[in-house]
Amino acid sequence: MKLKKFFAGVLAAAMMLTVGATAAFADTPAAITHNQALTATSEIPLYKTYEVKNGTAPAETFSFQVKYLQVIRQDKAATAPYNTETVINLTGKETAFGSMTKGSESKSFTVTPTELGLGNPTGTGKYLYEISENAGQTVATTYAAPVYMAVTVAHKVDATTKQIKNGEYEYYV
């Protein structure tokens, strides 16, 4: 009986030490970071990584399309930038890679809120876009699956008075 109590006490002490030790050695929480506000002409970088696992790949230029999908939420005054499922023309938004032997390389291109149809908003809202890679003709190349991007249009706020600036907007991705 005494042996059972002894082991129960050791187990309880070990459990308390693990909880206490974890808290004692924990780092301070990371500082909260906020996305920077963008303007209608701010460049939003989009990245493409070209990876060759085996062999040599020929030079290739990847092109992309952006499709406006839907409004996630918007105020009553706002109008959507496009009809649902509208493909936005991104002529000249390609990434070119030279011939490569085993390895990977990343490049980027940019889009702006104006190119996404949000240059002259009529109100606040959150809009969803699909970015997809146009499939090329290179043998043994797997083209990337679509990715999604949400863009939020918010009222610009005066830094001093903290009041909304009517008719002025900022963007968050």
Question: What are the functions of these language-model segments?
Answer:
Residues 2-173:
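Solvent-exposed loop/turn and edge beta-strand elements of beta-rich ligand-binding domains
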